[in-house]
Amino acid sequence: MEAAKPRLRVRINDSYVKVARLVAGLGVATVCEGALCPNIFTCWGEGTATFMIMGDTCTRGCRFCYVKKGVPEPLDPLEPYKVALAVDALGLDYVTLTSVDRDDLPDGGASHFAATVRAIKRLRPDTIVEALIPDFQGVEEHVRLVAASGLEVLAHNIETVERLTPLVRDRRAGYRQSLRVLEIAKEEGVVTKSSILLGLGEDKSEVIEAMRDLRSVGVDILVLSQYYRPSRKQLPVAKRYSLSEFRELAEKGLRMGFAYVVAHPLARTSFKAKEAYLAAVRRVEAEGGGRRA
């Protein structure tokens, strides 16, 4: 039987309305809306948002994702500044950037990502910036361009276990390729993060193995969440994990050495992002290192 998404009672407060109006007014997009994120009211209600840059149309066809697929529009050269203006107007001290895949662009959009980070830093130097990036087809120089742009956190999701990757993700993605992206980012000295969706048909032992693989390339922050089928066009849910199973996996992750583990059915990559980043920084400081993990 397909797992049903929990029904939540939410309150739309003034902060939510402020974010919604500002985002619409500047013509910038958020993944909160585009991917039907279950935490939209929580995050927007706290005056935070994850901005989706480079359009709303993805060049890939991952079988779990609700984001529109097709031929994207050309990039908006003013978008980095529009996003920076939105971040400044909202007074955010932590912002997450993400995007669709743009395999139609020579660098996959890496330079656009970097320009957006720099634009934010020019207006708000103390704002912590996280970028949840595509794999840029595994091209090392493109990953390094974003990782060295001045951000604090680089996230890239492996999404699922190695065995299911060909079924779940687009054929141009790769499990080992994604691990290498995270390894390159860590070489640039930034905090790294990755997420795994549970309930796509994996065994728990495969999840633990994927967690070990992430630690082997130095990933600091792990996010585990339940897969919910956005529509009948996506893969069905194979299993619904219990809260106790999430707690068990979180405990295993902490024992493996992750600085922070977000494990909850409704968790997404940007959920509790600031809290997770600060935990990673505290770990580095406790070990006698610098600011970055």
Swiss-Prot record:
InterPro entries this protein is in?
Answer: Aldolase_TIM, Elp3/MiaA/NifB-like_rSAM, Lipoyl_synth, rSAM
What is the protein's major site of localization?
Answer: cytoplasm
Question: Which co-factors does it depend on?
Answer: [4Fe-4S] cluster
Q: Which UniProt keywords apply?
A: 4Fe-4S, Cytoplasm, Iron, Iron-sulfur, Metal-binding, S-adenosyl-L-methionine, Transferase
UniProt entry tagged with the keyword Cytoplasm: yes
Q: Which residues form the Radical SAM core domain?
A: 44-259
Query: A GO molecular-function term, please?
Result: 4 iron, 4 sulfur cluster binding
Q: Where does [4Fe-4S] cluster 2 bind?
A: C58, C62, C65
GO annotations of cellular component type:
cytoplasm
Pfam families cross-referenced by the UniProt entry: Radical_SAM (PF04055)
Q: Please name the NCBIfam families in this protein's record.
A: lipA (TIGR00510), PRK05481.1 (NF004019), PRK12928.1 (NF009544)
Identification of the protein by name: Lipoyl synthase
Taxonomy, top ranks, is:
Archaea, Thermoproteota, Thermoprotei, Desulfurococcales, Desulfurococcaceae
The encoding gene is: lipA
